């Protein structure tokens, strides 16, 4: 009887739990810091039990891991290496949806020696994106073709009808991580040249990206795309860019917040949680160093530190800042620094309301040179909506692949020990097939150029 330990009870974990509970032989233990939370989480789910576990207690964590065949780690990625060490020590397996970081990668030799399978990067991005990238690249190479360009963009967004705020974005989890990602620098290949973009300039590089006529997407690059030349075995590719999709208007608004200093984590006494809560207009004035907190002075200062594209852009962004309350007398929720204080307001105003749904869009676009020297464009596209008052698209598309990979480890389909991620068709093929049965697949299209 396979035994599974599920660490975490976030929104992604429930689709994982539901998928694995379909197999009657699986015994699933859900661990949370408080027993009541774990019990509420498994309510109505067969063959599951709840335990209280503090993952900061390494001895208790190791004991729990050692008592199960496989541990699913859906807690913050900083804990994954600790979970993997405990599993490897006892010859057990692990599954995560996170990128393999250096601390995880260095456990490769120990995992192989112990016969432990530590599967990672099996959500949507990373995860489903890898599956179809590997599939397409292998198909092209087997046919004697070359990948000349690889573009991959993904966005978790509100459905168009629910994108009703100045950012066209909503938070289903902490806004802090979303905003911090906007400060990351980017590195990619474009037309054979290495391009590097500083984090502060990232939003300026955003440009329209066409997938379907009904959606106004913009794209910008993510972190280091250059590593995928080797990982995906496409040394011939002159352009390799992985990036993020947002609705139009998002980058300009974020760029203004960056210029104003609201993505800054520097502690400020006047934003201390112990200090009296100041009105928003006073905080805005202090952060941007305006002459006063009057709306006229705030707008004057913002106009001097941020270059608006045109008058329409200026009007839209200033209206957005007003919508957030940044020129108002409403007290802020002080969280120590400008970034976290802004996050408190974003999380208050930009949550999904009851009955609203999210959307996930993912597309790979390959420019291919065939064996015969002809050009073709290949696309793999996923457009998925959440269910109002049910699973979000993001939860399903991260949680179900994690559940599928877990089951394939237990069934012996994934059977190579080590620290793994989807890197070849031996791993990717069965995952693609099983996910398709769950209704999770990318639509593939080939357009031959004359």
Curated annotation (Swiss-Prot):
Residues where NADP(+) binds: 9-12, 32-34, 54-55, 75, 97-98, 124-126, 174
Pfam families xrefs: Sacchrp_dh_C, Sacchrp_dh_NADP
Pathway: Amino-acid biosynthesis; L-lysine biosynthesis via AAA pathway; L-lysine from L-alpha-aminoadipate (fungal route): step 2/3
A biological process term (GO) from this entry: lysine biosynthetic process
GO cellular component: a single term: cytosol
Top-rank lineage group of the source organism: Eukaryota
Keywords: Amino-acid biosynthesis, Cytoplasm, Lysine biosynthesis, NADP, Oxidoreductase
Catalyses which reaction(s): L-saccharopine + NADP(+) + H2O = (S)-2-amino-6-oxohexanoate + L-glutamate + NADPH + H(+)
Location within or outside the cell: Cytoplasm
Assigned EC number: 1.5.1.10
Subcellular location, principal: cytoplasm
Gene Ontology molecular functions: saccharopine dehydrogenase (NADP+, L-glutamate-forming) activity; saccharopine dehydrogenase activity
Quaternary state and interactors: Homodimer.
Family recorded in the similarity comment: Belongs to the saccharopine dehydrogenase family.
Protein name: Saccharopine dehydrogenase [NADP(+), L-glutamate-forming]
Organism: Schizosaccharomyces pombe (strain 972 / ATCC 24843) (Fission yeast)
